[in-house]
């Protein structure tokens, strides 16, 4: 994301990144979906991490030990039971992240983009909510609703369906990210 590193290829971290680690990063966002990851604009002093679902919860603090020192860490995933479970697990691994677009208000705003199919196009089914100690009260409320299907039409809203401009506006306005948001310079990844 950072302009200084924007011309470099994406990095895949398979061993702890301790040498030549970035020292000027003030903002980090962990993204669940590759399309959204690729649509994120350049942002000074920021890094975008493709969490790739539950993969982010397994070894992120081992692979990126400096991540917890970044002052502003955001997680944005699918609005479904798995996405919220991933958020909970990230926090319980020691990542002090704030979520965006993962609460009941966001669900109601983007419900029109919902689906009843999982990532493999198989029908979603309701489930019994599990403990999620890393969620806030509002996030837990949405998690339970998405598990049980109570008073909602869809069990899943994919992250990539939400306009990227809406997310970057939230990052700018609510989390003070230095993102330029003039006109239509930020691509909209809502292509489905």
Give names to the regions the model predicted.
Residues 1-72, 82, 88-101, 105-192:
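Nucleic-acid enzyme cleavage-core boundary/entry regions
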Residues 78:
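Active-site glycine-centered loops adjacent to acidic/histidine catalytic or metal-binding residues
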